[in-house]
Every structure is written in C-alpha cells, then in structure tokens.
Amino acid sequence: CVDNIANKTFSEQDLPFIKDIEKVALNRSKHAKILAHIGVENTPEAAYKLLLKLKYLDQTFNPYPARHGIPNDVDIETEMDEVELVDLTHLNSYAIDNADSNDADDAFSVDGDKIWIHIADVSMIVAPGSELDLYAQERASNLYLPDQILHMLPTSITKLCALGLSETSPALSIGFVLSGKEMQDIEIVHSTIKVTNISYDDADKILDSNEDLAKIQTLVELHRQYRSNNGSMSLSLPRVDVRFKEGQVEISDQASSPSRELVAEMMIMAGRVIALFAQDNDIVMPYAI
C-alpha cells in the first residue's frame, strides 16, 4: 500500500487508506497515518494534490465547499401562500442583470410620476421559523463559485420567485414619488408583474432611447446628486467575474457601466424608502452600511 501510493498509484485494497487521505483533503480529519509514511504533509492542500496525482479525484473537483462544511443543494417541497396581489402587469418592468443570469431578483418600472422597484417575493413561500427559513439562515446567502452555485434556498424556489421566468411573476413592490430630495406617496405591496429581462450591455444601448429607462436614469442621477451633497462616498473598486466553462477558467473584467450604476442606485433608493416606511410604522429593522 505504502509503495503503491508513494509511486502515485493505488489498487482496490488501498481504498481504506485513500479514504483517510480524502478526509484530510476535505478538512474532515487532521491526520492520515499513511501521509507521514510517504513524506507528505498532513494538510488539506497536500492531501488534495496527492489525490489528484493518484487520479482518485478529477482536477475539476472543487474541495472548498466540503472543507467548509457547506452541503450540496437540497430540494424541499414548497408551495406559494395565497396572498392578495396588486396587479401591476400593465407596467413595463425591466430586470437588468448579467447576460447568463436566470434568477433575476429585482426589476423597475415607471407609472406616471411614480417609480416602482420590484423585489422577488420569497416571503410568499418562506414563512418565519419554517423549515425553509431555518435552512436559509444556516446558509445565509448564495455562494457563487467559478464552477457552480450553492443556493441559499432550494432551486425550486427560484423557479417560483425569480423575475421573468414565467409570463407573470410575484413580487414585493416598492412604489414612491421622488420630489426633490423627498420620497413621497410610498407604497409597499405584494404584486404580480410582467418582466422583460435585459442584459447590462443591452440596457446600456437603450438607456437614452427607452422612455421608461430614460426617466428612471434621470431620477437616479438626481438621487445620486442628493446623496453626494449630503456627504456620500462612492468607491470604485476593480471587480472580475471568474467562471469555469468546458474545462477552461475564464476571467473577465466587470467594468462599471451606466446600467450597473443605475441598478445600484435603485437599490439604494429602495433601501431608503423601506427605512422611511419602517420608521413611520414603528417596524424594527437592522441598519446595514
């Protein structure tokens, strides 16, 4: 066994020792006796490299989720609560996201002087304290890795809640009128909307020519100026997208663009409106910076 593994090969009889090495590679054990015998460090990285050389693991295998105790996605049966929905399907709602995204979670629309920001309404499925709620709390957020996405919630919920996957989508809609520096005529409702999904690149091309997006862009610039006048700071840090496709690593610059800045500012506006709503209705909420 020792000779086999030292020579970067193994047989079926060696599998118990290989399993011990795998436990070290995945951070489930701190020590495998055989590693000391063949002069390999008892560390996850050294054990992982050995398993690659033995061709026990494929080079595309990502050990990091297992090392950190992050389980694979689990499917949990879900059904949507029956809630009275405000019909906003007459509005053109735009979900701007990466070209390869299929789980848009925000969209925007214009209704006269009123702006609507729509958020995927997971609350219609995930009740406080439910099995799904506890599952999501344990995961905290989606984990985006180059080779996979480990979801905070079962992927079946994405199919129900993601904006634009169906002809109409349920949403939590935040409506307001921006009058000078004031947010007025605030509404927060459960709604149903009709969504047009559009990539950042395509949105950049029509920001000026699309009547709705041009109006939103004007209000976004006014709100950004209001924040700047009140001492806000904007940090422009380099960002990249790292993806693993067809056995190749792809690294691309995530350059800033007008549509990305528009989406970011709309989320800030949504946060401000929700904070005002919570304040007016004595709702206790965390404050995030």
What is the meaning of each model-derived region?
Residues 44-57, 61-62, 75:
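Hydrophobic alpha-helical transmembrane segments
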Residues 2-30, 34-39, 49, 67-68, ...:
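Electropositive polyanion-binding surfaces
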